[in-house]
């Protein structure tokens, strides 16, 4: 589909979405895009518009205690790993609140470069510029942490943390 930069989102999705379900419209992709509405316009650098279920219509009895054969899990928290090759319908729910940062090495499995991602995030959070530089802050962008943000069991907003760290570095070096 050919579209113009700045085209209204509603005109792009007209006839392709159901009005009776709660959906989340994302200007961009699921990992790095941002939430928008039908009244917003296509961003200049966006190459796609993504629509996913909001997930607010799901009530799960006993939540985390159930075996969840139909839920996707990166680290085998649910029994869904027994059914290989299955396609899952993901929604926008976080499924739990924020937790303390857990040093489990899960970022290292999905980061596109060979750095200590968890230590870099910790250095950014505390504002230790020397440690940030030693751990490779100049080599990363917020988008590099999109997949680690998806798999993060601590549910931290890693892309925002990295953006704040880069902004802090720019102010310090200016």
Give the residues covered by each predicted segment.
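Redox cofactor-anchoring modules in respiratory/redox and cofactor-processing assemblies
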Residues: 1-174
